[in-house]
From Swiss-Prot:
Keyword Calcium: no
Keyword annotations: Nonsense-mediated mRNA decay
Alphabetical list of InterPro entries matching this protein: SMG8-like
Record Pfam families: Smg8_Smg9
Name this polypeptide is given: Nonsense-mediated mRNA decay factor SMG8
Family: Belongs to the SMG8 family.
Species per Swiss-Prot/TrEMBL record: Aedes aegypti (Yellowfever mosquito)
Top-level division of the source organism's lineage: Eukaryota
Positions in coiled-coil regions: none
Signal peptide stretch: none
Polar residues biased stretches: 589-604
Region (Disordered): 566-626
């Protein structure tokens, strides 16, 4: 018969049943549980109890399996528990979790492993007298403390409520008493890990064991896992006996297959048989035997001297405790609680019946998902076991909840009545960052979604801002509302702008309609201006309904409409920079009517943009002497006076009559349908008064033009030399009147009758949203007032495209916009004419719109007067407003929009003595 028998619960071989189920068979139950690092998961290897290595006999390990071991001549039953703390079992469970995806993170998997182990440990505490906790290292795993503490809570709160009732109802386990267990089991801690102490140095090993015992005892007492009353403790610790053992036996981690290979190699390296001594040969052969006496005769086995048991082994320590259990039982209580502890050693048959019942209560039923407990206390145990054991999940849930609370408070701090989605996202990100400082574990994503939903609910429940964009791109600051009219919106942004004449500055609300931006504000501020309502002005074409039944025009193919209308119109589609529209018989300057003596081909109305830029560069690069000569030739023009246009030309010049039932919904631009006019003008042209208002020595006075930055309130002089041809009668009349006023004889003035010089003052004014105004002296140069102001000429702004947007000189680097053109006309028998065109680029100059005033002919300005042309504040294309750039610099200003060159011209006027 094998000295050590074993079987796996619940299958008991008949031969073993006959031995164990004897009526007088009493045994001390020793549970072996903990961790193992070998593939068989067998933790009894280091006990020196097994005659054969488990790797040669045991099958594959399985989580939850309980194997019984006992000696035929002994009275100790060893229960070997295979749990999730065994390395091989844990690896299999991990692979299964990865394949199924049940545990999607480490914390959940670790929680599962701890919960399964704790359930088996609690069951062992109920059915064992002693428990050996095996640790494959030399260090105590302090994570056991949380498991012990949780099991103590579970036992006191749930187990002691339902288990006595169930035991009584089942008529099994009467020997367990009111504590529903054999006794308070005594724990032995076995460490199989190697340490620096050699096995021969027994004293040092024992000193180490004593030190570890003291540390473990303190930790268990501190956590109240053991108390003075062992009956109220989860388990007990012996008061005067060892309960910690450091194993120095290398067999615990040996592999028989590898050992056999090593011995075979050693045997092959030895001398031939017969050449070594009999004693050495016998020792080597004993190593090869799988168990003692294997392959030897019975006489040989019995003939040897009895082998004495090793003095230092964990099995020896266990048997000492077993002897105490049989003699006195375990009473590890302190002082007044001694003698009150329950200790029972029932017959094996009675114990086994109770074991099966408790196994069903603690192991089988929790694994059965369809099991419905009848007892309320037992049901509470099943529902709350994992919650109590799983301190990691509780910890992570608590820190997530704490972080969640702080994040919620952070989000709600200093919230305005209404706020935008951008502000909401910013506040949420701040709250999220605070949450992530505290939150840890698998619940982070779940709580993060809850935080997102919470913040969104606050924002959407009465805090959401309208955010409808203004024409300047600013969102509406009001709460979410349904607006029937864009005027119902308000961004709360206030700008500073000057009126049409520039005399008065006022605050304006951020516009939401083109009418509000380009018309209504200027009508409103005109009431506060002492000038605007009294000034002479040019009226631009607007829609005039013939009845109350009118509507906005709807058109699909604008290009087709334009091509059809161009045949009956003298307006040309936008192809770049256009000259003022003239003909050979027109009495004003055309694009080709230049002096033959002029070296350049530049005119007021420039035919070619590249030609304009070439001459502008040449002009800028010449010296002072050449500059004067070039300037004289550049600004010399020829006016040919012909007969009035005949009837045919007049008919040709007549445009299609505008519609009186449909109006243009947007702003006029070069490709707008012919015959449609807007409801209001986006441009303004007013006469500020006589030319004497402006004095070039002092510039624009503050009381006439407010808000100009220092040194930039000067207009630019533009000297134009005019030569008359084929107009003797016109020139003679002009000279006669002029000489009569000057008392000069006609003969003296005849030589100069065909030549005279005009001085025109031009100012291209920019205005930022804070009301800062300044004049520019060139496409990329801001006018700087000073002693050199006379040297700056208006030619640069006349013959070059001027940017619509330019950086302001103020601290905030705001974007200034071209808002006004100042023209001081000369006192001469000619009229300055204007045909302004503003080209706005979009999508990196991939598309553009050229906006016009809608006048069929260039605008004629009166002589000797100060005129101000106010440009639109906002430009709107066919698909909506054209947003100004958020930032701009001098190098890329022209990429966003330009005021096309060629907007100025000269036309003859009637001669009168009042003029001269």
């Amino acid at each position: 018969m094998n000295p050590v028998e074993s079987f796996v619960f619940p299958d008991i071989p008949k031969t073993i049943r006959d031995v164990l189920f004897k009526p007088d068979k009493q045994m001390i139950i020793v549970g072996v549980i903990g961790k193992s690092s070998n593939p068989t998961c067998n933790k009894l290897i280091g006990f020196n109890l097994l005659t054969t290595h488990p790797a040669l006999t045991d099958s594959k390990c399985c989580e939850g399996r309980i194997k019984f071991y006992f000696e035929n001549d002994g009275n100790v039953l060893y229960l070997h528990f295979e749990t999730t703390f065994d390395q091989q079992v844990m690896a299999e469970q991990l692979a299964k979790a990865i394949d199924t995806g049940v545990q999607d993170n480490f914390v959940n998997f670790n929680s599962y492993v701890r919960s399964r182990f704790a359930r088996m440990l609690l069951f062992a505490i109920q059915v064992c007298h002693m428990i050996v906790l095996v640790e494959p290292t030399s260090v105590f795993d302090t994570s056991y403390l949380s498991i012990f503490k949780s099991l103590k809570i579970i036992r006191e709160k749930y187990v002691l409520k339902f288990l006595p009732k169930l035991l009584k109802a089942s008529n099994v386990g009467n020997y367990m008493g009111k504590e529903a267990r054999l006794c308070s089991p005594r724990f032995i801690f076995l460490f199989e890990g190697t340490c620096d102490i050699k096995p021969e140095d027994v004293e040092k090993l024992e000193a180490l064991e004593c030190a570890v015992e003291e540390d473990i005892y303190k930790m268990l007492r501190t956590e109240f896992i053991i108390t003075n009353n062992s009956a109220m403790s989860l388990f007990s610790i012996p008061r005067s006996k060892k309960f910690v053992f450091f194993s120095s036996d290398s067999k615990a981690k040996s592999d028989p297959l590898l050992d056999s290979i090593d011995m075979l190699m050693e045997y092959l390296d030895k001398p031939a048989a017969g050449q070594q001594g009999d004693k050495d040969e016998e020792e080597f052969m004993n190593k090869l035997r799988p168990c003692a006496g294997y392959g030897m005769s019975a006489w040989s086995v019995g003939a040897g001297a009895p082998k004495t048991e090793r003095e230092r082994s964990v099995l020896t320590l266990i048997k000492k405790h077993v002897a105490e259990a049989f003699e006195h039982g375990f009473d590890d209580s302190v002082s007044k609680y001694r003698g009150r502890s329950h200790f029972a050693v029932p017959g094996f048959k009675s114990w086994f019946e109770g074991f099966k019942f408790l196994h069903k209560i603690f192991i089988e039923n929790p694994d059965n998902q369809n099991y419905e407990p009848v007892d309320v206390d037992y049901k509470a145990y099943l529902e709350n076991f994992h919650k109590v054991i799983d301190i990691d999940e509780r910890f992570f849930a608590d820190v997530c909840e704490h972080g969640m609370e702080l994040a919620m408070v952070n989000y709600k701090e200093m919230l305005p009545h209404h706020y935008s989605g951008t502000f909401h996202e910013k506040k949420y990100q701040q709250a999220r960052e605070l949450f992530l400082r505290y939150a840890r574990g698998p619940e982070v994503e779940k709580h993060e979604l809850k935080l997102k939903d919470y913040c969104d609910s606050i924002w959407l429940n009465g805090k959401q801002q309208c955010e409808y964009p203004s024409l300047r791109g600013n969102p509406c600051a009001l709460g979410k509302h349904k607006a029937n009219d864009p005027m119902d919106h308000s961004s709360g942004v206030v700008f500073v702008s000057a009126c049409n004449c520039g005399r008065t500055q006022g605050h304006r609300e951020d516009p939401y309609t083109i009418r509000q931006a380009n018309y209504e504000f200027y009508q409103l501020i005109a009431k506060s201006c002492s000038n605007c309502t009294l000034l002479e002005r040019i009226k631009f074409p607007v829609f005039e309904p013939s009845s109350s039944d009118f509507r906005a025009a709807e058109f699909i193919n604008k290009n087709l409409s334009n091509l059809m209308s161009l045949e009956n119109s003298n307006r040309t589609p936008d192809t770049g920079t256009h000259p003022p529209m003239t003909n050979d018989h027109s009495p004003h300057l055309s694009g080709s009517q230049k002096s033959q003596d002029s070296a350049s081909n530049l005119t007021f109305s420039i035919d070619d943009k590249e030609e304009n830029e070439t001459h502008a560069k040449n002009y800028a690069s010449q010296g002072d002497a050449d500059e004067a000569l070039e300037q004289e030739n550049l600004n010399e023009i020829v006016i040919k006076v012909g007969e009035h246009a005949d009837q045919t030309d007049k008919e040709k010049a007549i445009l299609r009559q505008p519609s009186t039932t449909e109006y243009l919904p947007g702003m006029l631009h070069a490709t707008s349908p012919i015959g449609l006019l807007p409801q209001f003008p986006s441009w303004s042209l007013v006469c500020l008064g006589p030319s004497s208002i402006y004095t070039h020595n002092s510039g624009l006075p503050e009381h006439i033009q407010s808000g100009f930055l220092s040194g930039s309130n000067f207009l630019l002089p533009w000297d134009v030399s005019v030569r008359l041809e084929h107009a003797q009668s016109w020139a003679a009349s002009y000279e006669k009147i002029r000489n009569r006023k000057k008392n000069v004889s006609q003969s003296k003035s005849s030589d100069s009758s065909n030549n005279f010089t005009l001085k025109i003052f031009i100012g291209i004014e920019y205005e930022c949203l804070r009301g800062h105004r300044f004049i520019m002296s060139g496409p990329d140069t801001v006018l700087r007032g000073g002693s050199g102001i006379v040297r700056d000429s208006g030619s640069k702004v006349v013959f070059n495209d001027m940017p619509i947007y330019f950086p302001c000189l103020c601290r905030n680097s705001n974007v200034a916009q071209l808002m006004r053109v100042h023209i001081v006309t000369p006192k001469a028998p000619v009229n300055v004419i204007l045909e302004p065109k503003a080209k706005i680029f979009q999508n990196n100059m991939q598309s553009n719109f050229t906006f016009t005033t809608g006048q069929p002919e260039p605008i004629k300005l009166t002589q000797s007067a100060y005129w101000i042309l106010r440009l639109p504040f906002v430009y709107e294309g066919d698909e909506g407003p054209l947003m100004p750039p958020s930032e701009v610099n001098a190098s890329n200003a022209a990429m966003h929009g330009i005021l096309l060159a060629g907007m100025y011209g000269i036309k003859e006027s009637e001669i009168s003595e009042e003029l001269l």
